[in-house]
Amino acid sequence: MSVNIVVIGMQWGDEGKGKIVDFLATHADYVVRYQGGHNAGHTLVVDNKKIVLHVLPSGILHNNIISIIANGVVLEPQSFINEIKLLEAENLCIRKRIFISESCNLIFPYHVFMDLAREKQKYRNFIGTTGCGIGPAYEDKVARRGLCVGDLLDLSFFSRKLEENVNFYNHQFTNFYHTEKVSFKEIFSNLLKVSDVIISMINDIPDLLNNAINDNKSIIFEGAQGTLLDIDHGIYPYVTSSSSVSGSVCSGAGVGIKNLGDIYGVVKAYSTRVGNGPFPTELFGELDAYFCRFGNEFGATTGRRRRTGWLDIVLLRRVISINSITKICLTKLDILDNLEKILICTSYHLKGVKNKKWDSVPFCRNDWDKIKPVYETFLGWKQNTRGITEFDELPKLAKKYIHRIEELIKVPVYIISTGPDRQDIIIRN
């Protein structure tokens, strides 16, 4: 049987999934993106060179890897082509190693304009989206008016449906949002410039992947965002528009659940999130500034400064349960090197409720504002861990921190990232 791995973010995205996938892809045949769009930003550092991918799977940097964009993804054509050109400028030959599902819904400029128009209208209650048009594109998919990659094979049909959609959105822009209209001719003309490249990559992805499984090939399914942003299991309404849990591999790529192997959960040694929404362990002041500076906590897609906080075991336990996570990949351990003390949230107290201890998430969304984290405190190791590749070489207090995380979540920490480069990794047996 083939060895298939699902790589899932355990927080609010930005956990370092790209680096983990890039590392694991050394022994893989396929890497598959199965949900999300170009709102994801996966940062890789190879030979001290930083590469940020938004659409293409992180395994694309390996010459032997076939990269798949499956049906659960929403694809913005120009961003996709730009990313290909970016990698080709690095002398990577990739076009013949990329396949796209005919069922991928496409993102158009009217989706982006709608995204931004809505955020402007919400004022203080905005979600904090990336403004990439992801939400409106998924809305069109669910409303059954979306245009798919496969529709490009019949340009007469495509043109007619696109004009209908442009008229649909322009009506809203004019009458509800009081913004400028979008041009059908401009959108269609720009799409024609890149359509041949996209058409050349269309393939039957479920058939391709299931044949690969039968041939004992190794497949990595690369998640985007994180479980706490999942449309169903995230902290609603501050969520993304797709399902970012392990179960979405089946619907987003067209493979059966029995063909999934290990579920790797990627988690930072602390917490971050971009955008608005509850964040029980959020830090402010000097500690927040420390993590932003030394962790370079700025969004790969938006450039926005990430909010920072301590590791939250309550949320991690829930994420492990939802995803059936079998192995933990702990990233950015080295960012904790200079701290005097390190905290882990092990439970919550609900403000105003005496002696009430919470070991799970609240039922009422308003209760998120009343949560007070309960912490365990650890002494910092105050030693350099960057670039360490053997677990036994870690400082004693760093190992104690990792062991305590394992005790609390009941899942082994298998991979530890000790720096940005692809070689800064510890594998535990």
From Swiss-Prot:
Catalytic class of the enzyme: ligase
Catalytic activity: IMP + L-aspartate + GTP = N(6)-(1,2-dicarboxyethyl)-AMP + GDP + phosphate + 2 H(+)
Gene Ontology biological-process annotations: 'de novo' AMP biosynthetic process; IMP metabolic process
Textual note on the cofactor: Binds 1 Mg(2+) ion per subunit.
A GO CC term assigned to this protein in UniProt: cytoplasm
Keyword Cell inner membrane on entry: no
Binding annotation for Mg(2+): D14, G41
Active site: residue positions: D14 (proton acceptor), H42 (proton donor)
GO molecular function annotation: adenylosuccinate synthase activity; GTP binding; magnesium ion binding
Positions contributing to GTP binding: 13-19, 41-43, 306, 332-334, 417-419
Record EC number: 6.3.4.4
Binding-site residues, IMP: D14, E15, G16, K17, N39, A40, G41, H42, T130, R144, Q225, T240, R304
Keyword vocabulary terms for this entry: Cytoplasm, GTP-binding, Ligase, Magnesium, Metal-binding, Nucleotide-binding, Purine biosynthesis
Cofactor needs: Mg(2+)
Binding-site residues for substrate, renumbered to this chain: A300, T301, T302, G303, R304, R305, R306
Gene3D superfamilies: Adenylosuccinate Synthetase, subunit A, domain 1 (3.40.440.10), Adenylosuccinate Synthetase, subunit A, domain 2 (1.10.300.10), Adenylosuccinate Synthetase, subunit A, domain 3 (3.90.170.10)
Superkingdom field: Bacteria
Known pathway: Purine metabolism; AMP biosynthesis via de novo pathway; AMP from IMP: step 1/2
Compartments (UniProt record): Cytoplasm
Function, in words: Plays an important role in the de novo pathway of purine nucleotide biosynthesis. Catalyzes the first committed step in the biosynthesis of AMP from IMP.
Subunit structure: Homodimer.
Family: Belongs to the adenylosuccinate synthetase family.
Protein name, entry field: Adenylosuccinate synthetase
Origin species: Buchnera aphidicola subsp. Baizongia pistaciae (strain Bp)
UniProt lineage: Bacteria, Pseudomonadati, Pseudomonadota, Gammaproteobacteria, Enterobacterales
